[in-house]
Amino acid sequence: MCNFFTITVSPYLHTDKETEVYRLKKLWILFIFPALSAFFLLTFWEKAAVGTAKFTLSAMNPIKAVKYVINTDAPFSDTPVVNSEQNYTDNPTNPFEGFTLASPSPPPLKQPVYDTGCPIAVMTYVSAADDITYKKQNCYVKNVTKISRSEVESELLQETDFKVKKNSDEPQILIMHTHATESYQNHPELYYDPEYTCRDTDVTKNMVSVGKIITDKLNDLGYNTIQDATLHDYPNYNGSYDRSKVTVEKYLAQYPSIKVVLDVHRDAIERSDGTRIKPVVTINGKDCAQVMIISGADNGYLNMPDFKKNLRFASHFQNSMESLYPTFTRPILFDYRNYNQQLTTGSLLIEVGGHANTLEEAHNAAKLIAYSLADTFDGMQ
């Protein structure tokens, strides 16, 4: 009887080793497995609440796994964010059916720091008549020569000795650049980098780009204009005017129809303490670099017998700019300078802003220059 009971009730407890295995299995089922399950569940819940959990949803989507990131920096949204641009909702088995899976928002742009201790001062020059600045209508001329006031004023707004034809088949205007590599501030902040030279051989960033806008707009307005994009100041700055003189002479020989030669530059205005001046004015809601015409005078040694005719043209051009766009200009600088202005009676140098302006401000100004030139030429018809 006892032997039978032992055989039927304890068939699996035949050895001590088998008895130990049984006890371990029982312990795993009753205690260890539930404890581990609870631990993993609590760990996941805690990390999800903090917002730092990253896990793979392969169990939810056996077709394609994506990583789900809880972003505590972003405003609350029901839309999950995934670190892939691919949208997996095309798959009908996708558990995110009905959601829009978006790429994570890019991090906020780090604002560049330009506080180098080298400041830029914004200034709008307002013209006013005084002992050396003369006014006729809306034309202002700053006379720093020894030529009398009455003699200078008598030239202002007199008729030019040339007319620019509209809709001509032949070039009437030449836009060129003696200092073509002059460029502008490469950021909008009111500090400048003293290591940055404001010179650039890239024609999309230097004076060639400003001249191109003037050229294109004048052609649109019916005035046949050509542009020379030679970098006369590169690789050598010295001798720039000698080289640009040769260029202009070649164009005049090839196109004797040219009446106006405009040498487009930018200025460089800086105070003794190192502060750079940014001459700017807001016109039609846009910031524009203020401009200044330089008309040269002969001191007896510059070989400019017709310099007063250039001044006449400058005064008409200035008058148009100020009539159309008040405060757009600084007074014409009338000084003993040559700048190859002896080559035609319509030769002028124009400064479009300064090295503290931005390229965008210069481009905005270029459009107004073109409209003003067209207005000046329209008055000659």
Please place each PLM-identified region on the residue numbering.
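Solvent-exposed loop/turn segments at secondary-structure junctions
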Residues: 180-183, 231-235, 266-271, 298-301, ...
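A short, glycine/acidic-enriched catalytic loop
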Residues: 193-198, 269-304
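Alpha-helical scaffolding within the catalytic cores
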Residues: 248, 273-281, 332-338
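N-terminal catalytic or cofactor-binding beta/alpha core of small enzyme domains
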Residues: 20, 31-259, 268-273, 367, ...
